[in-house]
Regions:
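Active-site microenvironments that recognize anionic phosphate/pyrophosphate groups
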Residues: 1-163, 169-237, 243, 256-261, ...
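Domain-length cofactor-binding catalytic modules of enzymes
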Residues: 271-273
Length: 339
C-alpha cells in the first residue's frame, strides 16, 4: 500500500560512554493511536489500510484469513534491499549508522480482539506458525544476523493499537541481551537443563506441556515474570515442529490468563530470544539450507520471556541498571499456580 520508508529515516546512534545503542526512528512518531482512528487497520475488511501482506493463514487467498504478517508501516529498521541508501560522498558520521533490517507486524485475529484470551484458537496458533515461517525465511539471508519476536500489550507496555498483534524484527547485528545470554553459561554446555532443574527444586514451575516448561524467572524484573523454555535443546524457534509451535501458543495463553487473574488489568510485554542465524565462522550452508548450530552451546535453547508491567521503571532501574521486584520468585510462582 505505502511507499518503502526512506532508508535515511532510521539510524542507530551509539553512546560513546556506555556503548549503548539507540534506534532513531522518526516514523514511529506517526504511529496512530487507537482513540484517533475511525476504523481499525487490522480488522478484516480494512486490508487496504495496511502494506501488502507477506504471509497469511490460510495461504489460499480465496479463503478468509485468520492471521496475517505484514511489513510495519512505521518501522524501527529499514530493509535496504528495497529502500537503498542514497549515494552520498564521504563516510557516515561518527557514532551512528543506518539501521538495516526487517520489521513486521503479525495480526493475530481478523476480529477486533483486544486480548489474546478472546482470539479463536486456530487463528492464535496460526499467528505463531506465520512468525516461525517468516524467521525461517529471514535466516537464509546473508545480510541479517539475528531475528526475534516481541509483543506490547496495553498502554503501559507501549501498545498504540488495541487490536491484538505482535512484532517481528531481524537485524544485522546480535542484540546485547543475546550476547550476554550466550556468554552467561560460561563452561556450562547445557544451562537450560540446570535452569529447569533449579526451578523444579525451588518450586518455581507454574505449568508444563509436552514440550515446554513455564517457570518464574530466578531473578524477576517484575512480580510474576515467567519464562517458557523448551524441554529439548534447540537454538532456533524457526526449527520448531508443528506440535511445539502449537504447544507454545497454548501455554502462552495459559500463562497470560494466570497473570490476568493474579494481577487483573496488568499490561505486559513478551519477547522471544533465539540464537544468531549464523553462530560461527566457517563455510556457509548450501543454498536453501538453514545455518549451522556451531558456536552456540549444545544445550542452548530459544525461549520466551513474559514480563507483566506491574511497577513503573524509575530512577533506580534506569540510572543504576538494576531492577526491583516486590515479590520473591517463589511467591510469584505460588500466586500464579493458585489462580
Amino acid at each position: 500500500m505505502s511507499e518503502p520508508p526512506d532508508a535515511r529515516s532510521c539510524q542507530i546512534h551509539v553512546d560513546p560512554l556506555s556503548g549503548r545503542s539507540v534506534f532513531v526512528a522518526p516514523a514511529r512518531a506517526q504511529c496512530p493511536r487507537e482513540e484517533a482512528l475511525d476504523v481499525c487497520p487490522f480488522c478484516a475488511g480494512n486490508e487496504h489500510l495496511t502494506p501488502d501482506e507477506v504471509l497469511r493463514s490460510p495461504a489460499d487467498r480465496a479463503l478468509p484469513w485468520g492471521a496475517r504478517l505484514i511489513p510495519n508501516r512505521y518501522p524501527i529498521v529499514v530493509d535496504h534491499r528495497f529502500s537503498p541508501m542514497p549515494a552520498t560522498p564521504g563516510a557516515p558520521a561518527a557514532g551512528h549508522r543506518p539501521a538495516h533490517g526487517v520489521h513486521d507486524v503479525i495480526v493475530e485475529s481478523p476480529r477486533h480482539d483486544r486480548s489474546i484470551l478472546t482470539v479463536e484458537a486456530p487463528h492464535w496458533r496460526a499467528s505463531w506458525e506465520l512468525a516461525r515461517q517468516r524467521l525461517e525465511q529471514l535466516a537464509l539471508r546473508d545480510d541479517l544476523v539475528w531475528g526475534g519476536l516481541f509483543k506490547n500489550s496495553g498502554r503501559a507496555a507501549g501498545a498504540s493499537l488495541d487490536h491484538v498483534h505482535s512484532q517481528l524484527v531481524a537485524l544485522d547485528f546480535v542484540p546485547p541481551p543475546i550476547v550476554a545470554q550466550l556468554a552467561a553459561g560460561g563452561g556450562d554446555r547445557d544451562p537450560f537443563t540446570r535452569i529447569i532443574a533449579v526451578a523444579e527444586r525451588e518450586q518455581r514451575v507454574v505449568a508444563t506441556s509436552a514440550d515446554l516448561v513455564a517457570l518464574v524467572s530466578p531473578a524477576p524484573r517484575q512480580p510474576l515474570e515467567t519464562w517458557l523454555v523448551p524441554r529439548r535443546p534447540g537454538p532456533w524457534f524457526h526449527d520448531a515442529g508443528p506440535s511445539v509451535v502449537a504447544g507454545l501458543a497454548d501455554l502462552v495463553r495459559e500463562i497470560v490468563a494466570r497473570i490476568e487473574r493474579a494481577a487483573p488489568g496488568a499490561d505486559f510485554n513478551w519477547w522471544l530470544h533465539q540464537a544468531p542465524f549464523r553462530a560461527s565462522s566457517g563455510p556457509e550452508p548450501e543454498a536453501g539450507r538453514r545455518p549451522r548450530e556451531g558456536g552456540v552451546p549444545p544445550g542452548w535453547r530459544w525461549h520466551l520471556e513474559i514480563l507483566p508491567r506491574i511497577s513503573p521503571l524509575a530512577g533506580f532501574e534506569l540510572g543504576i541498571g538494576c531492577h526491583i521486584s516486590t515479590l520473591s520468585p517463589e511467591a510469584s510462582a505460588r500466586r500464579l499456580r493458585g489462580v
